[in-house]
Amino acid sequence: MTPREKNLAEIGKIAYKYGFTVEDMLGARRFKKMVAVRRECIAMLRAKGYSTTEIGRIMNKDHSTIVTSLQVLAAQNG
């Protein structure tokens, strides 16, 4: 299993826990609940030491979107 496949499997576990799919996490839809779960996936990848650019590649998002998500999480967690 490649590192990307391992990360997608972990993203899938988080997504499934909330009733979503990996495709939902990698897609462009922005339902409030989906965005919150996507941010949890981003936080998990960041905790594993990935850069914002690497997370962007994994999540099919621009790195600036990843930076914004991490800033929102930091603000929420004080």
Question: What are the functions of these language-model segments?
Answer:
Residues 47, 60, 71-75:
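Residue-level detection of the helix-turn-helix DNA-binding "recognition helix"
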Residues 34-50:
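Short, amphipathic alpha-helical "recognition" segments used to contact nucleic acids or chromatin
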Residues 1-14:
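General nucleic-acid-binding
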Residues 44, 57, 68:
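DNA-binding alpha-helical recognition surfaces that contact promoter or target DNA
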Residues 16-31:
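Short, Lys/Arg-enriched N-terminal segment that forms or immediately precedes the first helix
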Residues 11, 51-53:
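Helix-turn-helix DNA-binding elements, focusing on the entry/boundary residues of the two helices
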Residues 53-59:
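Short alpha-helical "recognition helix" segments of helix-turn-helix
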Residues 34, 67-78:
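Short, solvent-exposed alpha-helical "recognition" segments
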